[in-house]
Protein backbone atom coordinates (compact mmCIF):
# COMPACT_ATOMS: atom_id res chain seq x y z
CA UNK A 1 0.00 0.00 0.00
CA UNK A 2 1.25 3.46 -0.87
CA UNK A 3 0.46 6.47 1.28
CA UNK A 4 0.84 10.02 0.02
CA UNK A 5 1.36 12.73 2.59
CA UNK A 6 2.36 16.37 2.38
CA UNK A 7 5.98 17.13 3.13
CA UNK A 8 7.03 17.70 6.72
CA UNK A 9 7.84 21.17 8.09
CA UNK A 10 10.59 21.04 10.72
CA UNK A 11 10.44 24.14 12.92
CA UNK A 12 13.84 23.70 14.58
CA UNK A 13 16.84 22.30 12.74
CA UNK A 14 20.34 22.83 14.14
CA UNK A 15 21.87 21.11 11.14
CA UNK A 16 21.71 17.92 9.12
CA UNK A 17 24.07 15.28 7.77
CA UNK A 18 27.06 16.55 9.72
CA UNK A 19 26.48 20.19 8.70
CA UNK A 20 25.92 22.52 11.67
CA UNK A 21 24.07 25.75 10.92
CA UNK A 22 25.98 27.38 13.80
CA UNK A 23 29.47 26.27 12.78
CA UNK A 24 32.10 28.95 12.15
CA UNK A 25 32.87 27.37 8.76
CA UNK A 26 29.24 27.39 7.54
CA UNK A 27 28.88 28.46 3.92
CA UNK A 28 25.86 29.01 1.72
CA UNK A 29 26.84 25.88 -0.23
CA UNK A 30 27.01 23.72 2.92
CA UNK A 31 23.71 25.06 4.26
CA UNK A 32 22.09 24.38 0.89
CA UNK A 33 23.56 20.86 0.88
CA UNK A 34 22.02 20.16 4.30
CA UNK A 35 18.62 21.40 3.13
CA UNK A 36 18.79 19.33 -0.03
CA UNK A 37 19.71 16.19 1.91
CA UNK A 38 16.83 16.76 4.34
CA UNK A 39 14.39 16.59 1.45
CA UNK A 40 15.30 12.93 1.07
CA UNK A 41 13.80 12.29 4.53
CA UNK A 42 10.46 13.91 3.74
CA UNK A 43 11.21 17.35 5.18
CA UNK A 44 10.22 19.82 2.49
CA UNK A 45 10.32 23.04 4.56
CA UNK A 46 12.30 23.97 7.64
CA UNK A 47 13.63 26.73 9.85
CA UNK A 48 17.39 26.46 10.33
CA UNK A 49 18.05 27.28 13.98
CA UNK A 50 20.58 29.67 15.45
CA UNK A 51 21.46 28.85 19.03
CA UNK A 52 22.57 31.24 21.75
CA UNK A 53 26.17 32.19 21.07
CA UNK A 54 28.38 35.28 21.00
CA UNK A 55 26.98 38.21 19.06
CA UNK A 56 29.67 37.90 16.36
CA UNK A 57 29.17 34.13 15.92
CA UNK A 58 25.38 34.52 15.83
CA UNK A 59 25.46 37.40 13.36
CA UNK A 60 27.92 35.57 11.08
CA UNK A 61 25.66 32.51 10.90
CA UNK A 62 22.61 34.71 10.29
CA UNK A 63 24.40 36.46 7.41
CA UNK A 64 25.21 33.12 5.77
CA UNK A 65 21.69 31.75 6.18
CA UNK A 66 20.16 34.98 4.86
CA UNK A 67 21.90 34.30 1.53
CA UNK A 68 20.49 30.77 1.17
CA UNK A 69 18.02 30.32 -1.66
CA UNK A 70 16.39 26.90 -1.45
CA UNK A 71 12.74 25.82 -1.58
CA UNK A 72 13.03 24.13 1.85
CA UNK A 73 14.32 27.30 3.53
CA UNK A 74 11.40 29.04 5.24
CA UNK A 75 13.32 31.45 7.47
CA UNK A 76 15.52 31.39 10.56
CA UNK A 77 14.49 30.11 13.97
CA UNK A 78 16.18 32.19 16.68
CA UNK A 79 16.71 29.91 19.69
CA UNK A 80 18.01 32.54 22.02
CA UNK A 81 19.77 34.65 22.94
CA UNK A 82 16.55 35.98 24.47
CA UNK A 83 16.02 33.27 27.10
CA UNK A 84 15.92 33.31 30.88
CA UNK A 85 19.37 33.78 32.43
CA UNK A 86 18.33 31.61 35.40
CA UNK A 87 19.88 28.17 35.90
CA UNK A 88 17.39 25.47 34.98
CA UNK A 89 15.21 27.65 32.77
CA UNK A 90 18.25 28.61 30.68
CA UNK A 91 19.01 24.97 29.87
CA UNK A 92 22.18 24.53 27.81
CA UNK A 93 22.31 28.14 26.65
CA UNK A 94 25.60 29.75 27.75
CA UNK A 95 24.83 32.36 30.41
CA UNK A 96 27.47 34.75 29.03
CA UNK A 97 25.62 35.00 25.71
CA UNK A 98 22.06 35.39 27.05
CA UNK A 99 20.78 38.96 26.63
CA UNK A 100 17.51 40.75 27.37
CA UNK A 101 15.20 40.98 24.38
CA UNK A 102 15.19 44.32 22.59
CA UNK A 103 14.19 45.48 19.14
CA UNK A 104 17.62 47.10 18.66
CA UNK A 105 19.51 43.88 19.45
CA UNK A 106 17.18 41.88 17.21
CA UNK A 107 17.82 44.25 14.30
CA UNK A 108 21.60 44.25 14.84
CA UNK A 109 21.73 40.46 14.64
CA UNK A 110 20.18 40.57 11.18
CA UNK A 111 22.74 42.85 9.51
Predicted regions and their residues:
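Di-metal (Zn2+ and/or Mg2+/Mn2+) metal-binding site signature of metallo-dependent hydrolases
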Residues: 3-25
Amino acid sequence: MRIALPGLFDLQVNGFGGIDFNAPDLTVARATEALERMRGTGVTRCLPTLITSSFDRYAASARVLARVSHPAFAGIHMEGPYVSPEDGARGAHPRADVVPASVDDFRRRQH
